[in-house]
């Protein structure tokens, strides 16, 4: 994924341009969907203690934001769009760091690429099932 399919050599892992890397994540999702069958997958995002760094980072930056919820969908594009929108809509002051990281790294591009591949819709409807929030 990190080399956008251009190499399997470790030395080349981080040589792809950033947008190609983001597009390869959408391609990887498509591969899983094709293999497993879209009807057999439910996606869950746990948006708690949000850091600007990827969860794959061995030494991530401390969390900038608190919990904004657990999101689930059978549509991975709608799910990720809802999570990004929740960051922007949050009243948490720490959101500024996440928004800066999203915008400076074109982070929404994976959602755009997945939508372009037909993996889902960027439109969604949120339904709160937490009785404490109603």
Question: Locations of the language-model features?
Answer:
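Extended, low-polarity segments enriched in aliphatic/aromatic residues
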Residues: 1-134
